Amino acid sequence: YTAKGGNVCFVAGTQVETADGSTAIENIKEGDRVFAANPETGEVAYKKVVRKFVNETNELVEVTVNGETIKSTPSHPFYVPQKGWTSAISLRAGDILVLSNGEYVIVEQIQHELLESPIKVYNFEVEDFHTYYVSANADSDEFVLVHNRCGYKPLRQNDYKAVINPDETEAPHAHIFKKASNIGR
């Protein structure tokens, strides 16, 4: 499946932890089993790839951990235990990422890169957990947890209205309203 835009993807050469060992993301196929996790329950398992995406982008974020640089599109979600799912562009040096062995690694550097011309980038949908682990190179044994973002849509500011603490006599809270469209049509 090919689409333009490269919303949430990784560059060719990014390694994915699979049941058959480390595999370059561009070589992942439907039916392959990738190591996945549910960070809410702590459950980990090999899960099947159900769909592959090839996109194009001219914008990347370089996430450096232990001297290795993982290159993704800016909106690709990484799991930060203290923050939850965090887009690559929102990561900061000092953020902690989860490794496939259950340990943690610290983000050393984030760099935003604009390319002169678009390049191919890759992603895929994983059954159940919708997550997988990536690394910068095949020799690494440190794979970080990322979300495939399929079936997951973040709130877009222009689609919603938030009313924060409308009654000051209550504990702090917010009401989120989806903006109506096409009323009366």
Spans of model-derived segments:
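Metal-centered catalytic cores of metalloenzymes
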Residues: V105, R149-R185
